[in-house]
Amino acid sequence: TRSGGACNSHNQCCDDFCSTATSTCV
């Protein structure tokens, strides 16, 4: 899985959790 990428418009990441604080995948 990838981390650190931007979340999409639905605040979702492909395989990771979206950090709403930084709007990035964690």
Curated annotation (Swiss-Prot):
Disulfide bonds join 7-18, 13-25. This is Conotoxin Eb6.15. The keyword Glycoprotein does not apply. The keyword Transmembrane does not apply. One of its GO terms (cellular component) is extracellular region. Belongs to the conotoxin O1 superfamily. This peptide corresponds to allele E1l. Has not been merged with other alleles since they may differ due to geographic variation (see strain in PubMed:19606224). Expressed by the venom duct. Keywords: Disulfide bond, Knottin, Secreted, Toxin. Its main location: secreted. It is found in: Secreted. The presence of a 'disulfide through disulfide knot' structurally defines this protein as a knottin. The cysteine framework is VI/VII (C-C-CC-C-C). Coiled coil: none annotated. GO terms for molecular function: toxin activity. The gene is E1. It comes from Conus ebraeus.
